[in-house]
């Protein structure tokens, strides 16, 4: 790998981004599971004033941390691994687009409903985000397969983690919902609740492991580049 010198400690930034993502991903998981179980953080008098603030911070961290990690990973990659660089750029572009669209919807800059129907602009933006999401998942799989076949150590472990993210997405977003819909019968509501909790735990675990290994890979590349 070619040598790189950094004016700032981007490895430390990646570490902070990874820790922030892990903490707030676990918080989001607990929040969602408690919601499905009929519990609420708002029942606590101590958490009532800070819950809305925590939710806003959680949303921002979970949107911005992946941008930072993928951006740093892309920046640290040597020029010779063009496939990984392109995949990283696609992933970063997807997360940037998701963040921008999320802010547009949250701040009501885009009208979602009009006369009881979804507006054309909202449909176009939602379709664009869904398409980019599918492309990013494929890019993640391609990057994972490349890392597993061409690299060793932490880079190979990152490849395995990215493949696990794809498997989690395939199972939790596509296979499990269809299976529950056709097999659950009269217990669909309870089955969907269990499926949602399992999907949340699986997906969160996969992403936490992937971003942890991405930080390790960035650290490895940074050590080589010094």
Regions found by a protein language model. Give the residues of each.
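Cytosolic juxtamembrane helix at the C-terminal end of the final transmembrane segment
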Residues: 2-13, 69-84, 141-159, 208-226
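Transmembrane alpha-helical segments of multi-pass membrane proteins
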Residues: 12-22, 82-99, 157-171
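Alpha-helical transmembrane segments of multi-pass membrane proteins
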Residues: 21-39
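C-terminal transmembrane-bundle signature of multipass membrane proteins
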Residues: 27, 146, 167-226
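Interfacial non-cytosolic loop connecting adjacent transmembrane helices
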Residues: 36-51, 106-127, 176-200
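Selected alpha-helical membrane-embedding segments in polytopic membrane proteins
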Residues: 47, 51-78, 85, 94-99
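Membrane-proximal helix-loop-helix units in multi-pass membrane proteins
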Residues: 97-154
């Amino acid at each position: 790998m070619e040598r790189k010198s950094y004016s700032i400690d981007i490895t430390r930034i990646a570490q902070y981004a990874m820790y922030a993502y892990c903490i707030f991903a676990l918080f989001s998981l607990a929040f969602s599971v408690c919601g499905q179980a009929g519990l609420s953080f708002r029942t606590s008098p101590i958490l009532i004033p800070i819950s809305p603030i925590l939710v806003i911070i959680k949303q921002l961290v979970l949107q911005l941390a992946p941008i930072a990690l993928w951006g740093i990973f892309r920046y640290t990659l040597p020029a010779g691994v063009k496939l990984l660089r392109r995949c990283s750029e696609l992933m970063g572009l997807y997360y940037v687009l998701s963040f921008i669209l999320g802010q547009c919807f949250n701040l009501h800059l885009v009208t979602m409903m009009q006369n009881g129907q979804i507006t054309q602009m909202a449909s176009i933006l939602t379709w664009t985000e869904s398409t980019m999401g599918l492309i990013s998942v494929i890019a993640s799989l391609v990057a994972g397969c490349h890392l597993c076949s061409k690299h060793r150590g932490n880079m190979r472990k990152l490849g395995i983690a990215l493949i696990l993210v794809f498997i989690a997405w395939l199972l939790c977003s596509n296979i499990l919902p269809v299976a529950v819909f056709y097999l659950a019968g009269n217990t669909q509501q309870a089955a969907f609740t269990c499926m949602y909790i399992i999907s949340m735990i699986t997906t969160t675990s996969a992403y936490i492991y992937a971003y942890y290994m991405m930080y390790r890979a960035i650290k490895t590349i940074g050590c080589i580049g010094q």
